[in-house]
Structure formats: structure tokens, C-alpha cells
Design a protein with these regions (language model features):
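Structural signature of hydrophobic alpha-helical transmembrane segments
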Residues: 2-12, 64-75, 118-131, 196-207, ...
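N-terminal signal-anchor/start-transfer transmembrane helix
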Residues: 7-27, 207-213
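Alpha-helical multi-pass transmembrane bundles of energy-transducing inner-membrane proteins
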Residues: 25, 97-104, 108-194, 208, ...
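Hydrophobic alpha-helical transmembrane segments in multi-pass integral membrane proteins
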Residues: 44, 51-113, 239
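Membrane-interface helix termini and inter-helical loops of multi-pass transporters
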Residues: 52-62, 174-189, 250-260, 375-384, ...
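Short helix-boundary/re-entrant hairpin motifs in multi-pass inner-membrane proteins
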Residues: 83, 196-266, 293
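Interfacial segments of multi-pass membrane proteins
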Residues: 223, 303-313, 377-393
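Cytoplasmic/organellar membrane-interface segments at the starts of transmembrane helices
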Residues: 351, 407-523
Length: 523
């Protein structure tokens, strides 16, 4: 088991070294190596996840949680790889380094999940923040990427100071930083005021790293509408690592110090505030990418509430919060990226597929069946009611209704305003039936089916277009040029949709199987 977890850390790190070298031979080798690495990792995760169940029931809680987290990490990185392969131009400098850093991100996240002491956990999270800043810098050319990276480092600096202070105090009070030492101190009955305070400082810093939106919005990279979707997916991965660290530490404190009620209650209250604040903000945004970020923050609030509660049922709901946050937010971010390309061939592609995919992602984030987000909301509400936390349960239920209304309003805005309904029934031009002499007629046909301000050909007549000049001729022959590339653009969205659907439908059967096998509610 240890060798398997170690392979999840080392293989992406080794592949990250070869990506820039292979990209010099062929540009597309960068995303190919990254995609194959993540696909192989997912296969290597799925098989042991089911093989460990009947063999050793005593190791099931830790092993299943670790494999589940590693699977979500590889899933998020795989979706980011597929989308970035078509969003990042092949001529962009440093394009191969983006995929190399993405592989390194997966390695760091798996290392944080497998960490057995507080210092290693913080070290992985801190390096992950620096890698995320580097990926933001190369996600878009010019000053946009550099500004987003510098903002990210500036905002996370106070959080890093709090984490370092907490780890230093924890080392001075305990003598080491291992999880087992904290458990032994709790069982021995010694005074534990200083260790709990130190862990509180560490969790506060990680909370700031997971929810950067508490900082001023104009200085937050999460609210930069000019940042590409690849950058937002990178920030999602960085938040995922901080969210997991908070969850891991809070469960450890809850189970070790059963009478540390103040810390657990404070974490629950913080999660409830984050949930309410992000839900209300999602109702007032007009950009789909920003709405997806707010939905991700609301999932973080639910996760902190579940971690503060600390019951087996709330821990089970936290697993599906991770799944819903990872897949649902990715789905909405990709749909938001397609809406921005108003002068490219992907606009009609969005209106032919984006309506359904956006609705599916929004329903999952809102907790509507049959998607995985339904189980995360339902289990958390049941756990809160069962523990007597009725106010928190009502807030979680009301937030689902408000998030659903935000999704429906955003969908109505995108598909009914500004003549968007014209794109949904737009006919594609058969490229094989076109000749060089047909270019003027086809260009006229494109202009007739487009709004004046959204002329498809204008994006390729402009010298500042983000696409290469040698592809403008092929664009005039087919506004949806590159069938393979357009499906590559939609592949992570459909992949996330299938994960959400399968997670919601197969969960009862998987739960009954694990429950009958282990006889335990805590998976």
C-alpha cells in the first residue's frame, strides 16, 4: 500500500522533468505525456480501491480516504490537461512548462494527502502555492498572468505567516510534529492548551489559503475575469489542497481531543459564514466563471462545517463534497470559458452543448439528484439535524435553493439574451464540400448567421487575433474548424458530467457493498 501511494507522488514528478525536453521534439508531446500519466494514475487508483476492502478491514478508513483523495486529484489534473491543451496556443512561450508544473501539482497534492506530520503537510501546501503562482504566470501571455501570480503570492503571504507560527508553537509544545504524538498527548490526559492553540493558528492560515475571497476582491486572482479558465482551474487545485489539509487536521483534533468543543464550533461557524456569504454573492454575479468560483467557495464552507461537526455521517458527506466541488466546479468553469470566445468557432459549440452541461453542473452544486452533489447536501443536512444543529442544517438547505436560482438565472441570461438563441440551431458548414472558390459565399453565410458585434470572421482578420495566421484560411472554410480540437475542448466537461452522474447513481450500491463488507459506517 505504501509503495502504491509513493508511486502517485514520484511518477508525476519524474514525468514533469521529461515534459519540457519532449516538447522540444514535438509541441503536442507536453499534453500527451501529462494526459497519459494522469490516465494511468486513475487506473492504478481504481483497482486497489476495491481490492483493499475485503482484505484488511482495520486499514479501510485511512486507505479508502487516501485513495479517494488521490483519485480526485488525478481527475482534476486530467480535466485541466485536456482543456488547457486546446486553450493554450502552441506558439506560446512556456506552454510546455504549464503541463510540467501541472504534473508537479499532482505530485504535491498526493504528497499532502499522504503526509504523516504537520510540517510535511504544510511544506507540500506551501510549495503548491508557489507552483500555482508559476502556472498563473504562464497561463496567459503579457502582464495578465504575471499580475495574477504576484497577487496570489501577496494574498497568501499572511496565511503562510500564520501557518509557520502555528507549526513553530506546536513543535515547542510537543517536541515533534507527528500526528501520532498529538494523539498520544490527548490520550495521556496532559494539558493540551498550547497544542490546540498552535493547531488553531495552522488551520486559520490554511483557511485563508482555501478561501482567498475573504481578501479584497480587486486584489484576488479568483475574481480576475481576464484570467483564462486554465488559471482558474489551477487556483481550484491550490484550494483543493488547502481544503484537504483543513479537513484532515480538524478530524484529527475532533477525534483526539473530544472536549475541544470551542475549536470545532468555531470551525462550524466559519464554514456556515463562508457558505452563506458565497451563496449570496453568487446571486449577484454576471460572469459564469466568477459564479463557479463562488460555488467552489460554498462547497468549502460545507466542508468546514462537516469537518467541525466530526461525526461519521458528516465525514462521509465530506467525501462527496470533495467530489462535487472537483467535478462540478470544473464543469462550470469550462462552460464559462466557452462563453468568452464570442469571435471564435467555439461559440456555436457552446450553445449546442453548453446549455445541458451548465445545467448539470449547477444542479450538482445545488444538491439536486441524481448527481453527486445531492448526497453531499443530504448527508450533511441529516448529520446536522441528528446532532441538534438545526440552524446550520436550515442554512445548508436554504443555500441549495439560492444556488439553484442563481444557476437558472445565469442560464436564462446566456441562452435568451443578446440573440444567443440564434446560435443553438446554427448549421455547421461541411468542410469537405468546400473549395477555394466557395470562400466568398461561405464568408457571407457566416456573416448572415452572426451578430454584427460577434462576427466570426473578424477574429481572424484582426492581426491581434490569438490564433495563428496560417489557420485563417481554414477558418473561412469552416467556422468550426478542427473537429478533433473542438471535442477535445468538450471532453473534460463531459468527463466531469459522467463523474457527477455516476457518483450520484452508484453511491447507494457502493455504500451498501462497503457497509456489508466492513460493518462500519465510516468508509
Amino acid at each position: 500500500m505504501g509503495n502504491t501511494i509513493l508511486s502517485f507522488i514520484l511518477i508525476p514528478a519524474v514525468a514533469a522533468v521529461f515534459v519540457p525536453v519532449m516538447a522540444k521534439v514535438k509541441t503536442r508531446m507536453a499534453e500527451s505525456i501529462a494526459g497519459l500519466t494522469f490516465l494511468a494514475g486513475l487506473v492504478n487508483i481504481i483497482v486497489p480501491l476495491f481490492l483493499v476492502v475485503p482484505s484488511d478491514t482495520g486499514r479501510i478508513p485511512a486507505d479508502c480516504m487516501l485513495f479517494f483523495t488521490a483519485g480526485l486529484i488525478y481527475l482534476s489534473c486530467l480535466c485541466t490537461t485536456f482543456y488547457s491543451a486546446s486553450e493554450l496556443e502552441t506558439s506560446r512561450p512556456g506552454r510546455s512548462y504549464f503541463f510540467s508544473l501541472l504534473l508537479l501539482t499532482a505530485s504535491l497534492l498526493c504528497g499532502a494527502a499522504a503526509a504523516e506530520n504537520f510540517f510535511t503537510l504544510y511544506l507540500y501546501i506551501e510549495v503548491l502555492g508557489l507552483v500555482a503562482a508559476a502556472m498563473l504566470a504562464v497561463s496567459r501571455s503579457g502582464t495578465v498572468g504575471l499580475t495574477a501570480a504576484s497577487d496570489w503570492i501577496f494574498i497568501t503571504l499572511p496565511a503562510s505567516v500564520l501557518c509557520i507560527a502555528g507549526i513553530s508553537l506546536l513543535f515547542l509544545s510537543m517536541g515533534n510534529l507527528s500526528y501520532e504524538s498529538l494523539k498520544q498527548m490527548a490520550l495521556s490526559g496532559d494539558p493540551f492548551g498550547a497544542p490546540v492553540f498552535a493547531v488553531t493558528l495552522l488551520m486559520t492560515g490554511l483557511l485563508l489559503k482555501a478561501c482567498i475571497f475573504l481578501m479584497p476582491q480587486e486584489r484576488s486572482s479568483d475574481f480576475r475575469t481576464d484570467l483564462p479558465v486554465s488559471g482558474h482551474l489551477v487556483l481550484q487545485l491550490a484550494r483543493l489542497g488547502a481544503m484537504y489539509a483543513v479537513f484532515r487536521i480538524s478530524i484529527l483534533i475532533r477525534f483526539s481531543f473530544g472536549n475541544a468543543a470551542f475549536l470545532s464550533s468555531s470551525l462550524m461557524f466559519t464554514g456556515a459564514v463562508i457558505l452563506v456569504w458565497s451563496t449570496l454573492c453568487a446571486l449577484n454575479v454576471k460572469d459564469l466563471k466568477r459564479m463557479a468560483c463562488f460555488f467552489d467557495f460554498s462547497n468549502a464552507g460545507m466542508l468546514f462545517t462537516a469537518a467541525g461537526l466530526g461525526t461519521p455521517l458528516s465525514v462521509l458527506s465530506a467525501l462527496f463534497i470533495f467530489l462535487s466541488s472537483t467535478s462540478g466546479t470544473t464543469l462550470l468553469l469550462i462552460c464559462g470559458g466557452l462563453t468568452e470566445r464570442k469571435k471564435t468557432r467555439f461559440q456555436s459549440l457552446f450553445y449546442s452543448h453548453g446549455s445541458f452541461l451548465m445545467l448539470a453542473g449547477g444542479l450538482s452544486q445545488s444538491g439536486i439528484p441524481p448527481f453527486a452533489g445531492f448526497w453531499s447536501r443530504l448527508l450533511l443536512v441529516i448529520a446536522l439535524f441528528d446532532s441538534g444543529r438545526n440552524v446550520y442544517a436550515v442554512l445548508a438547505a436554504v443555500s441549495s435553493v439560492l444556488m439553484l436560482s442563481a444557476v437558472l438565472r445565469q442560464r436564462r441570461k446566456l441562452f435568451t439574451e443578446n440573440g444567443a438563441e440564434k446560435y443553438r440551431n446554427r448549421q455547421e458548414i461541411d468542410k469537405s464540400a468546400c473549395t477555394e472558390s466557395d470562400r466568398p459565399a461561405i464568408k457571407t453565410e457566416i456573416e448572415n448567421h452572426s451578430n454584427p458585434e460577434e462576427d466570426f470572421s473578424a477574429g481572424y482578420q484582426d492581426e491581434s487575433s490569438e490564433y495563428e495566421p496560417d489557420r485563417r484560411k481554414e477558418f473561412l472554410l469552416d467556422p468550426l474548424y478542427g473537429n478533433g480540437e473542438k471535442w477535445l475542448k468538450l471532453l473534460p466537461a463531459w468527463f466531469s458530467f459522467l463523474i457527477l452522474l455516476c457518483g450520484g447513481i452508484l453511491f447507494p450500491f457502493l455504500y451498501m457493498y462497503l457497509h456489508l463488507t466492513t460493518g462500519s459506517l465510516f468508509l
